[in-house]
């Protein structure tokens, strides 16, 4: 259902957007700018990472044994605490100690990206679109230039999805690793005399997906995440807003939209039925709207999921190999092999196993 403007309508005043038309140029994604703006004013995004989003709030910790859950999630907390409580004073101290001596923003961008790559990040630069920032969190993004950073999730763990035999849960360590390393990149920027503010991967204050696409790092996949040429669908995102006008990257057309329309293995394999086959209009964007409530409710009852990522041939066989095969033959590499696999779904609250086709109630 679309929103409509009317007299006396209550709206939320947001900071100006440097380039609100940038989203209109994303390959393979249709955007209604007027509706997107209206949603931002009338019904802006709310801060809600999946475990805290009603009606499944606290479902994840309730359905897990603390002895299993705490060792996985506890290491992800310190980077978030530093982000919320300490980085602002750290920023003031470091930029005062290291005044900026160069105004060459192009060189600064190269140095930042080189350092980020040494820590395992892919990176791109775009302008912050505050329509995709949660209500009340504009102050957490004090600058318009945003460096988007992506880190690869471990392929060997994801290949076990959804029955993670190599460990109890999927790769939660990515949140600890990327969380601390994004602060290291931020401190590198501060040592160049540039003020900045970092956001860690486990964060509901901003929609990373759209900014990663705007920064030219990948395209929107059918499963709702970004597909990159380096890692396919298996990365987690973080970002840094900084007080410098770095040269911007542009969205890229990798042919992913057409490939996903032909593939849709994530749709066929999703055990929760959370990924629709057809696109719909959602908050001004024409896309496949993932039912995140159904997705997370299912995820919470199992020892992880990640079936949508594991079903993606771009993850299994490599981006270039799959896209080259599709360009030559018009066929999806490994499709029949992936469809023939049986899912073994293990409930978190017991060692009971459910086979593909059975429902979890």
Feature roles, as predicted:
Residues 10, 30, 220-223, 234, ...:
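Compositionally biased, intrinsically disordered low-complexity regions
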Residues 104, 108, 172, 180, ...:
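Intrinsic-disorder/low-complexity, polar/charged segments
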Residues 113, 122-333:
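Catalytic cores of enzyme domains
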């Amino acid at each position: 259902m679309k929103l409509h403007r009317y007299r006396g309508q209550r709206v939320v005043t947001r900071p100006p957007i440097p380039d609100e038309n940038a989203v209109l140029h994303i390959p393979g994604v249709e955007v209604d700018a007027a509706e997107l703006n209206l949603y931002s004013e009338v019904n802006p995004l709310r801060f809600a990472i999946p475990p805290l989003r009603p009606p499944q709030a606290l479902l994840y910790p309730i359905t897990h044994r603390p002895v299993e859950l705490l060792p996985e999630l506890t290491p992800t907390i310190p980077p978030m605490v530093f982000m919320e409580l300490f980085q602002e004073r750290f920023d003031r101290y470091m930029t005062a100690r290291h005044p900026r001596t160069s105004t060459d923003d192009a060189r600064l961008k190269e140095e930042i990206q080189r350092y980020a790559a040494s820590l395992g990040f892919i990176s791109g630069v775009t302008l912050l679109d505050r329509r995709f920032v949660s209500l009340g969190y504009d102050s957490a993004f004090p600058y318009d230039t945003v460096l988007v950073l992506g880190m690869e999730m471990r392929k060997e763990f994801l290949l076990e999805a959804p029955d993670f035999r190599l460990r109890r849960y999927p790769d939660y360590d990515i949140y600890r690793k990327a969380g601390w390393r994004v602060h290291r990149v931020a401190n590198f920027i501060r040592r160049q005399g540039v003020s900045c503010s970092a956001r860690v991967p486990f964060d509901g204050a901003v929609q990373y997906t759209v900014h990663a696409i705007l920064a030219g790092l990948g395209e929107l996949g059918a499963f709702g995440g970004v597909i990159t040429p380096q890692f396919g669908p298996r990365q987690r995102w973080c970002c840094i807003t900084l007080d410098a006008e770095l040269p911007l990257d542009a969205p890229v057309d990798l042919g992913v939209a057409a490939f996903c329309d032909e593939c849709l293995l994530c749709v066929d394999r999703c055990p929760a039925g959370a990924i629709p086959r057809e696109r719909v209009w959602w908050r001004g964007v024409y896309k496949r709207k993932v039912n995140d409530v159904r997705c997370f409710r299912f995820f919470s009852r199992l020892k992880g999921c990640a079936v949508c990522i594991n079903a993606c041939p771009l993850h299994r066989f490599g981006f270039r190999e799959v896209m080259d095969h599709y360009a030559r033959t018009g066929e999806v590499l490994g499709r029949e092999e992936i469809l023939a696999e049986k899912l073994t779904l293990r409930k978190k609250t017991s060692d009971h196993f459910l086979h593909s086709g059975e429902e979890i109630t």
